[in-house]
Amino acid sequence: MVNLPFAGHTNPTLGLARVLTDMGHRVTYIHSPAWREAVENTGAHFVPYDDYPLFPRPFQDRMRCWRAAYRTVLRIGAGYDCLLYEMLFVSGKALADRLGIVPIRIFSTFALNEHVLEDFGRNGGLYLTSIFRFPRLRALISAPMSRRYGWRFRELEAEIVRNSPALNITYTPRSFQVYAGEFPQSRYAFVGASIDGCRHEPCELPEGGGPLVYISLGTELNKSERFFRRCVEAFGGTGVRVVMAIGNSV
């Protein structure tokens, strides 16, 4: 297994690593050094990225991790049966093909195709979706990455959509998947949410019997105090129980 150092893309995969090791499989998980404890708690063998700092600066976490993860898999991956990679590691399919092993892609949220990415680029926030909104920007970014990582296609969207592995595991129920009918059951397993339990800290839900709503902005764009205040105002006095993940910056 290989992943990039982002909590929202990593946490859903830890339960899978645990299940595979419990079944007797030898699982090696390549990740940032900061994720050693979380990975080793699953029973998997942890391998840190080659030539990567223990405490990287934010820019390194976002950029250098791609090359470090790729080089580490390339160095040790040939002896394995398959490569499980989270979808953000776009080079996973091309890398598995280069190593001659089976690729398996994991979607930590919903599955992607050209229609999903088109909607994503049109409706999502500019910071994360501009690459899918502006073709020239996408081409400018895609070309050097395609050459460096041996993509089948020169363009990012084509590599994601058209160079798809035979098995894709999606942590979203099919009933929640947008354009669900465009994802064949023979290639996409919609397994639902992966929640590995509260193993490290006590986890107590709000008291009461009302509906439970979980609110999160993820790990990247989560510094909106205004958003969380509006959620409190919206649900206040409704009888709804609310759990908010606000990180350490609000």
PLM feature segments, named:
Residues 81-82, 167, 212:
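Structural motif
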Residues 3, 28, 172, 216-219:
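Ser/Thr-centric signal marking residues that sit
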Residues 5, 59-65, 145-149, 193, ...:
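Short, flexible loop segments at the rims of nucleotide/cofactor-binding pockets, characterized by
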Residues 77, 162, 206-208:
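A short, aliphatic-rich alpha-helical micro-motif
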Residues 175-250:
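Donor-nucleotide binding loops and adjacent catalytic segments primarily
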Residues 102-178, 183-187:
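Active-site-proximal region of nucleotide-activated glycan assembly enzymes
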Residues 1-135, 142, 226-230, 235-250:
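Glycosyltransferase specificity loop/lid
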Residues 64-68, 86, 148-153, 196-199:
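Short gly/ser/thr-rich secondary-structure transition/capping motifs
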